[in-house]
Structures are given as C-alpha cells and as structure tokens.
C-alpha cells in the first residue's frame, strides 16, 4: 500500500469533502499547513512534527497521536472525541474554544498552552505538564487528573468544584480575587498551604 504524507492527504481532502479517514502518518514534518475545518477519523500520527499549522474548527474522531511535536499550532474551536495524545509536546499551542470529549492526554506537555473557554468532557490528564497554561473560563465535566503538573496555571473563572487535585501539583496557580474557582475542590493536607495563601490565610 502506498504511503501518503499528511500534506498529500490534506490536499486530496480539500479537493473532495475535507475528510480524512483511516490515515497513518509517520515521521511527517509539516510546516505552515492550513488544516482548518478538516475532519479526521480513525487516523494515527506517530513521530510527526507540525510547525505553525492551523487546525481551527478541525475535528478529530478516534485519532491517536504518539510522540508528536506541535510548535506554534492553533487548534482554536477544534473538536476531539475518543482521541489520545501520548508523549506529545504542544507547548505554547492555542486550544482556545476547543472541545475535548472522552479523550486522554498521556505524558504530554502543554506548557504555556491556551485553553481559554475550552470544554473538557470526561477527559483524562495523566502525567502531563500544564505549567503556566491558561485554563481560563473553561467548562469541565467529569475530568480525571492524574499526576499532572499545574504549576503556575491560570484557572480564572474555571469552576473546580468536585474535582480531585490530590494527585497534582498546584503550586502558584492563579484564580480570581474571590477564589470562587476553588470552592468544593478536593486537595490534600500538603496542598492546603498553597490554597491558604491564595485566600489570604497565613499558616504559622
């Protein structure tokens, strides 16, 4: 079977119905591609590098990304369902307004990434890095956070009620002046001083 690059698959999709299905892409280096509004289903991306690519309003169904690097990429208003990102680097990428449902982010990096007004529905973060990420005004429904680093992350106007952060690093997180985002969140005794500092309580 002939191997097709992502650029070739994208060009073919643009000529037809903006639809990519059952694709397998390995070691592709893609720069400056406009994959906006593309619909990708049941496809695998492995050891691929995407630089300054646009995935605005793109949809990914049952897609797997392994050991991929996304640099300067925009996923604004993109949709992910039953997707898995494993050992991927998405530092500084823009996921504003994106929706993720029934998806897994495993051992992946999202440092400085922006998820402003994004939606996570039954999304699992497992051993991932969200240091200094912008997780503002998000809507979270039954997410699972496992050993995830949120150091310096901004949760402004993102309600965390009912969420379990016991397994995570939350040093230096940012919330609103009222700290309303933290009401009902589950933390450990070791994490309590971090939250106390946010609400102006001094522990002696």
Model regions: which residues?
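Tandem repeat scaffolds
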Residues: 2-204
